[in-house]
Amino acid sequence: MRQRSVRISALALAVTAAMGASAFAPPAHAVRSPHAAQSTPGHEATRSALRDLVEKGGQPGVAAKTSDSRGSWYGAAGYADTATGRERSPGDHFRGASITKTFIATVLLQLEAEGRLSLDDTVETWLPGLVRGNGYDGSRITLRRLLNHTSGIANYTADPEFVHNAAGPGFPEHRYDTHTPEELVAIALKYPPQPDPEKAPSYSNTNFVIAGMVVEKATGHSYAQEVTRRIVRPLKLRGTSFPGTSPQMPDPHPVAYSRFHQDAPDAEIHDATEQNMTWLGAAGDIISTTGDLNRFQRALIRGELLPPAQMEEMLDEVPSGDGTGYGLGVEFAQLSCGVKVVGKSGRTNGSLSAMVGTQDGKHQLTFNVNGDWLQDGSLYVNAIEAEFCGKTPLSTRQPSRALPDSLPDSFATRPGSGD
């Protein structure tokens, strides 16, 4: 039987590896009660998949919202705060991590439609000297190749020292550090380019850090200002923001629980809610809500944000294997029932998210888990399968390392993974 490509290498989570802070161990009841907090009737398969993320996956809580021809549905399980028993709520703000990339790509495509740049422009044209040396030549890398991960530029979040500080034992000391885009690109360029990137896409956060720099160079404004002006305000995404150096989260929000990517079942759990997201910047600093992301996804796919020519460019798929592929700031996955979905996933410290929809723009799902140690990747994918297929496949267990190994976002490798 064909395994549903859900080693969803593309559409499954931004693996930005977890950060943690002050020691905080949730009480045992945190994952014992998979009740559906404030869930509304319907979507039984999805409801069951959410409960499984808490009950079988050991996650603190999960919240999801869907939108289709029948209207909107909200479902949740577990807790926003395991210490107080506060449940997840429809208005919860969370860190969407690499879902940011879809917003950045949309802005660049809008700029192309306005004649202010071309995606066939090179990095060297816009940012002279930035990508040069150690086998790199920015005059041969186009903006398009940044957005579909065929640039070959190394992923700075695979650097061992960076991982140590951003995701491991160094996090408590470094959680409030501010990073510049130039610093992040310089880390990446210490490593040689990926071979034949146009034949085999290689996911790299560095691509979108550079893309954010191009937005700033082309407009004279930060990527956050441009996304806010062009997308957030017109769509009235009132729960969406780009925090910059601020480590705070707007209320309401769940506690973001992290295990520092320690695999031991009894690994200590930490509160990673506060963090300075300049370590991802244009590659992943968005804060949003399930409702906002559904609205954005629907407007985008229905062509409300881009002209037809740019929409076609965004959805031009570069296959990455097993029924998955990359567009420009979006990813594709073929589900077990034959439905092909498009969207983006995101994972950062204490937060796992997905923004997924059908390619006709008629059906959307966004969900967020406020924990980051899910070892059984099939439980995550089952939430997508349940919503768009109405059921989950018979196979429900991926290898214990399936999640980090199969997902290319943010941290392509983990400390000690050897990948």
Can you annotate each of these PLM segments?
Residues 1-15:
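N-terminal export and membrane-targeting signals
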Residues 57-60, 84-145, 195-204, 281:
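Short active-site loop at a secondary-structure junction
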Residues 65-67, 97-98, 102-118, 206-217, ...:
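Primarily hydrophobic membrane-targeting regions of prokaryotic envelope proteins
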Residues 135-341:
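Short, surface-exposed loop or secondary-structure junction motifs
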